[in-house]
Amino acid sequence: MSLTNKNVVFVAGLGGIGLDTSRELVKRNLKNLVILDRIDNPAAIAELKAINPKVTITFYPYDVTVPVAETTKLLKTIFAQVKTIDVLINGAGILDDHQIERTIAVNYTGLVNTTTAILDFWDKRKGGPGGIICNIGSVTGFNAIYQVPVYSGSKAAVVNFTSSLAKLAPITGVTAYTVNPGITRTTLVHKFNSWLDVEPRVAEKLLEHPTQTSQQCAENFVKAIELNKNGAIWKLDLGTLEPITWTQHWDSGI
């Protein structure tokens, strides 16, 4: 899929991986990049505009933990501005297993709620045009970093939820896939808390292993968006992009 003249909404598009991905996206000659983030970063917005002045870049403050009704209200404003949205990227995430409720609220519940809100505009059963959802998971959603089980569990939930969305595409008209970064050198992983402090040095130990840069991750992130494969589970690790084949151990039969 060509991203030329597309309208993209990027939740957490100013974070570590998010900002580098936004830089790559504007190089693709989007029509609009709408960034929703908790913290404003005018310098980053100015930089993105300078990379490609032809792309209209808009920022709205957004906390993914707000009720669905508030997200729906914000999306109504965005749709009024850009008329159509082609791609939604759900990228908000925290890594701190001391904050159990907030980890689940940001990494999973917020993603589900943002998705639920945009379905109000996209669902073909309501006359919507459909759309594409790219959810950011993590390789920990495949195999946990066992010292951070809350974070890992939240990312496993993202993979499962997104796979369900993909299978619902014939009903809703909305396709979905996950991009799942491996350990990427961002502020997220420089220092974080393990669950119940089971491993005080978990961040240091993790960074002793091979990692990738956020730029490497961002380049493959955008490649995955361009490939636009419904139901795909992409692994973005060590500068590579690889589709994951999920092993089915049970079938609901419905």
Swiss-Prot record:
Keywords: NAD, Oxidoreductase. This is Alcohol dehydrogenase. One of its GO terms (molecular function) is aldehyde dehydrogenase (NAD+) activity. SUPFAM superfamilies: NAD(P)-binding Rossmann-fold domains. Signal peptide: none annotated. PANTHER family: ALCOHOL DEHYDROGENASE (PTHR42901:SF1). NAD(+) binds at residues 10-33. The lineage of its organism: Eukaryota, Metazoa, Ecdysozoa, Arthropoda, Hexapoda. The active site is at 151 (proton acceptor). It catalyses: a primary alcohol + NAD(+) = an aldehyde + NADH + H(+); a secondary alcohol + NAD(+) = a ketone + NADH + H(+). Belongs to the short-chain dehydrogenases/reductases (SDR) family. Substrate binds at residue 138. It comes from Drosophila persimilis (Fruit fly). Gene3D superfamilies: NAD(P)-binding Rossmann-like Domain. GO terms for biological process: acetaldehyde metabolic process; acetyl-CoA biosynthetic process from ethanol; alcohol catabolic process; behavioral response to ethanol; NADH metabolic process. The keyword Oxidoreductase applies. Homodimer. Changing residue 185 to K: In strain: Persimi44.
